[in-house]
């Protein structure tokens, strides 16, 4: 991919942690700062290295999107701010943080909005969460042009992915497939609205996948669902949703889980925690109470929640991510299609941003030309006091048209070159800016070489002057362009 997205010398800098990088306990501790996100976002802008800020906070991620004009100072300030607001030390945070800069940060937000980075592949809830984060940051006055454009592009990308693919059915398909397998293990011939009548289940976790499991169990006629989670409030919230859907349910903390396991015919775990949630010892104890009645354990987490050794306990069947690969072909096709859409939107956005980056330089060039024209008109007025106002205005209009014509092509070409993000040589860039015919500069050089010392030098002088003048204009313009579109200083070389 050609070029990087910078606004002047600034670029998007993202620092985050999610279910992929951090344990649930750490995520919960960091997420406590979202009680006053506007205050947090303004704290991020207390440092000169950052000019925009947006914080995306969900149950599975906490991401800090900023626009930084200096990479290292900006990164240090973000980490320090997270540590201050969460009450954690840098040493506790840093092993679990990920950092994306410039184009990579842009691509990450597009992936997030598309559900490609979610615990449940393709889930749509993240679109609303990102929109809410944007509105809150906008209200706090911490979002500028760059993050506005990026967020709107991400929301557009997410909508495209969900309307043009069926990736949002991937998570639901996995849960459905897992429960179909569970029915087979339990000797139930087919799925129906009363297939699990008289059976009880435990769902561990309170995120999107746990919610899907609870919903599917209800559709199969489960008698009762117990939702267990580290945070009891969230377990009770998910249980209340099940009750509203007509499924008897209750929420408990993980400390009550061992007792709940004894009554569960089906256990679905989807916490995303780091470390074992259900051990072989837990299941052995439960089976002693159950007198060996068949029990199906479904582990939908990565890394695993349920210890592999539980599969060796008599009367127990363990289904994990590896066991559920039979439904993946369609999902892979949808994921590939979704990533193709993200790639299209990413390239389009980068081109747009690169083109916008050259606008201030183009405006400065045009202003400089108009200032020079004004000075020349003042000089003309002093030199020709007898010229009528009508003639002077005619000259002024003519000169302005000339300046506009001279600047039109390099202005358009500069935007095209910037959008393309290609590296070109000085002669090629000069030819491109002024849209010179291919080979014209070589022809001029050949004529100059053939006439060297021939006595015809004076005849070529006007042509040489025009080329020299164009080169001088180009050098000045190119210097401004590169200063406007290249990261400034050693802190921006990441």
Swiss-Prot record:
| InterPro entries reported for this sequence | 4pyrrol_synth_GluRdtase, 4pyrrol_synth_GluRdtase_dimer, 4pyrrol_synth_GluRdtase_N, GluRdtase_CS, GluRdtase_dimer_dom_sf, GluRdtase_N_sf, NAD(P)-bd_dom_sf, Shikm_DH/Glu-tRNA_Rdtase
Query: This protein's superkingdom?
Result: Bacteria
Composition bias, kind Polar residues: at what positions? 476-486
CDD domains, per the entry: NAD_bind_Glutamyl_tRNA_reduct
Which catalytic reaction applies to this protein? (S)-4-amino-5-oxopentanoate + tRNA(Glu) + NADP(+) = L-glutamyl-tRNA(Glu) + NADPH + H(+)
Q: Where does substrate bind?
A: 58-61, 118, 123-125, 129
**Pfam families reported in the protein's UniProt record:** GlutR_dimer, GlutR_N, Shikimate_DH
Region listing for Disordered, in residue ranges: 448-494
Asked if Oxidoreductase is a keyword of the record, the answer is yes
**Marked site positions, Important for activity:** 108
- GO terms under biological process: protoporphyrinogen IX biosynthetic process from glutamate
Give the metabolic or biological pathway: Porphyrin-containing compound metabolism; protoporphyrin-IX biosynthesis; 5-aminolevulinate from L-glutamyl-tRNA(Glu): step 1/2
Query: Which principal EC class is assigned to this enzyme?
Result: oxidoreductase
What EC number(s) does the entry state?
Answer: 1.2.1.70
What GO MF terms are annotated? glutamyl-tRNA reductase activity; NADP binding
Residues of the active site: 59
Keyword annotations for this protein, in alphabetical order, are: NADP, Oxidoreductase, Porphyrin biosynthesis
Q: What SUPFAM superfamilies does this protein map onto? A: Glutamyl tRNA-reductase catalytic, N-terminal domain, Glutamyl tRNA-reductase dimerization domain, NAD(P)-binding Rossmann-fold domains
Q: Which HAMAP family match?
A: Glu_tRNA_reductase
The note filed under miscellaneous reads: During catalysis, the active site Cys acts as a nucleophile attacking the alpha-carbonyl group of tRNA-bound glutamate with the formation of a thioester intermediate between enzyme and glutamate, and the concomitant release of tRNA(Glu). The thioester intermediate is finally reduced by direct hydride transfer from NADPH, to form the product GSA.
UniProt lists the family membership as follows: Belongs to the glutamyl-tRNA reductase family.
What is recorded about the protein's domains?
Possesses an unusual extended V-shaped dimeric structure with each monomer consisting of three distinct domains arranged along a curved 'spinal' alpha-helix. The N-terminal catalytic domain specifically recognizes the glutamate moiety of the substrate. The second domain is the NADPH-binding domain, and the third C-terminal domain is responsible for dimerization.
Q: Subunit structure, briefly?
A: Homodimer.
Name recorded for this polypeptide: Glutamyl-tRNA reductase
Q: Which organism is it from?
A: Corynebacterium urealyticum (strain ATCC 43042 / DSM 7109)
Protein encoded by which gene: hemA
């Amino acid at each position: 991919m050609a070029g990087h997205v910078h606004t002047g010398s600034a670029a998007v800098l993202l620092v985050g942690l999610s279910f992929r990088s951090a344990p649930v306990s750490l995520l919960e501790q960091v997420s406590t700062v979202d009680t006053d996100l506007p205050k947090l976002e303004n704290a991020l802008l207390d440092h000169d290295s950052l000019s925009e800020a947006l914080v995306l906070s969900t149950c599975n991620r906490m991401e800090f999107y900023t626009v930084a004009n200096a990479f290292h100072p900006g990164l240090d300030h973000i980490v320090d701010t997270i540590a201050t607001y969460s009450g954690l030390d840098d040493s506790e945070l840093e092993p679990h943080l990920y950092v994306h800069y410039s184009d990579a940060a842009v691509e990450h937000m597009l992936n997030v909005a598309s559900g490609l980075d979610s615990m449940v592949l393709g889930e749509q809830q993240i679109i609303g969460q990102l929109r809410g984060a944007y509105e809150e940051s906008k209200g706090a006055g911490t979002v500028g042009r760059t993050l506005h454009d990026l967020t709107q592009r991400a929301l557009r990308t997410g909508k495209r992915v969900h309307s043009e693919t069926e990736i949002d059915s991937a998570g639901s398909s996995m849960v459905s497939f897992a429960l179909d397998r569970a029915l087979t293990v339990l000797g139930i011939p087919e799925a129906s609205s009363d297939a699990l009548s008289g059976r009880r289940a435990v769902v561990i976790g309170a995120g999107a996948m746990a919610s899907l499991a609870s919903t599917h169990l209800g559709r199969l006629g489960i008698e009762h669902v117990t939702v267990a989670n580290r945070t009891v409030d969230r377990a009770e919230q998910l249980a209340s949703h099940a009750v509203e859907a007509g499924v008897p349910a209750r929420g408990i903390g993980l400390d009550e889980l061992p007792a709940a396991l004894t009554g569960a015919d089906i256990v679905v775990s989807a916490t995303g925690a780091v470390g074992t949630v259900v051990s072989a010892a837990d299941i052995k104890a439960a089976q002693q109470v159950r007198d060996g009645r068949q029990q199906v354990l479904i582990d939908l987490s990565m890394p695993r929640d349920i210890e592999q050794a539980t599969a060796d306990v008599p009367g127990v069947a363990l289904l994990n991510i590896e066991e559920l690969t039979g439904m993946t072909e369609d999902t892979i096709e949808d994921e590939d299609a979704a990533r193709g859409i993200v790639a299209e939107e990413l390239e389009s956005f980068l081109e747009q941003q690169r083109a916008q980056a050259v606008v201030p330089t183009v405006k400065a060039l045009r202003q400089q030309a108009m200032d020079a024209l004004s000075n020349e008109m003042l000089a003309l007025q002093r030199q020709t006091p007898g010229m009528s106002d009508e003639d002077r205005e005619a000259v002024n209009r003519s000169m302005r048209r000339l300046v506009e014509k001279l600047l039109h092509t390099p202005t358009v070409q500069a935007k095209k070159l910037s959008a393309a993000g290609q590296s070109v040589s000085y002669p090629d860039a000069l030819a491109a800016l002024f849209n010179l015919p291919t080979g014209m500069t070589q022809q001029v050089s050949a004529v100059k070489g053939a006439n060297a010392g021939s006595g015809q030098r004076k005849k070529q002088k006007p042509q040489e002057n025009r080329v020299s003048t164009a080169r001088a204009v180009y050098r000045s313009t190119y210097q401004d362009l590169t200063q406007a579109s290249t990261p400034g200083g050693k802190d921006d070389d990441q």
